[in-house]
Amino acid sequence: MSAPKITFIGAGSTVFVKNILGDVFQRPALKSAHIALMDIDETRLEESHIVVRKLMDSVGANGEISYHRDRKTALQGADFVVVAFQIGGYEPCTVTDFAVCKRHGLEQTIADTLGPGGIMRALRTIPHLWAICDDMTEVCPDATMLNYVNPMAMNTWAMYARYPHIKQVGLCHSVQGTAEELARDLDLDPADLRYRCAGINHMAFYLSLEKKLADGSYVSIYPDLLQAYADGRAPKPNLHGNPRCENIVRYEMLKKLGYFVTESSEHFAEYTPWFIKPGRDDLLARYKVPLDEYPKRCVEQLANWHQELESYKRGERIEVKPSREYASTIMNAIWTGEPSVVYGNVRNDNLIDNLPQGCCVEVACLVDANGIQPTKVGALPAHLAALMQTNINVQTLLTQAILTENRDYVYYATMMDPHTAAVLGIEEIYALVDDLIASHGDWLPAWLHR
């Protein structure tokens, strides 16, 4: 069997590329793949090239490696396209999203999925994703795009809307990652869990979540989670080595809703109107909500990356540990025909009955030589669907804004955001949007400045 060509757009995300390729090179069918790295930042691209070459030597991978600053050249003849970039980066754009919102009285935690921060990020990002789709249509029309770029739902929706012929799936690690976290909270082996999960990106819920018993049968762990939370045994501290994020919000939502949500407490806190309010420091303290978490995380990650890069340069080998990312599983399944199941973000074509048709949903997908095949869920519990709809409203209006180049719909999307609407009045929301658009300047599409 011939080897595939795997193109990374945003290869300057070196740690992410290392994790994905560490998985890829453990797959016999992918070990000889041609790896094409593409990034506009020449320094970061060279850093990634050094790390990937050393990674290949460490695991005995023998494929070709090439690196490019021209996107179309990198995409030529690709079988798989992995997309992972952040338009505008931490500086200036993330800093702008947080500073401007704070100036208008709106606090945020992550700001990459919903709210004014997520909306601005979508407006910055979608034109670049469309440009990739243009190039793929020309030079690798049969390739499968594995998209890791946030805001996932809006990005995926916008690409489906304009480029329905592109094979693509939006990928996140929150479904499998949260399952591992909950296993840790209960001192279980994650391999003993099975679950069924569905919803929208960053707001999917485990409709069933079970552990395997000694006799081979399965039983729900929801009673165990609730009891562990009541006893103070869960959540366990220092999740992912970050003492600021204590995961209280999601356990409280489990108590209220009866189901556990996939994305982190710091994310979920800003998707709803309940946790972040002016003058309510008591709520922040009670639910351990870490304001400005993403900027802090960016600063720490940048510092850590410089240390990691130096260690990679000095060492003869790079240790390869399996990641929780789905990318290599998907590539292997499509390339070899060996079936697998992943959770992906796809168009809602009769998959979830009580969410809007055509929106972006996160469901289990069968993957084999026929590609990515989403599975039908049916109807979600009504209260979960209602909660998701509040987020889908924002996604719908933002997608409409960028498809029609209509600035009014940017205002509408921001007005409908649950957190923003709970804090600001209508005129304040319009003023905030105007300030964000002006502050971001040319990072945003030209039609927003007409």
Where are these regions (language model features)?
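Redox-cofactor binding/interface segments in oxidoreductases and associated redox assembly factors
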Residues: 76, 82-83, 147-148
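Internal, well-ordered domain-core segments that constitute the primary functional module
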Residues: 132-213
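Rossmann-fold NAD(P)-binding glycine/threonine-rich loop
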Residues: 91-162
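NAD(P)-binding Rossmann-fold cofactor-contacting core
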Residues: 29-53
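Conserved NAD(P)H cofactor-binding loop of Rossmann-fold oxidoreductase domains
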Residues: 85-88
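Long, compositionally biased stretches enriched for glycine and/or charged residues
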Residues: 187-450
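N-terminal Rossmann-like dinucleotide-binding module
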Residues: 6-31, 35
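Short acidic low-complexity segments
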Residues: 64-77
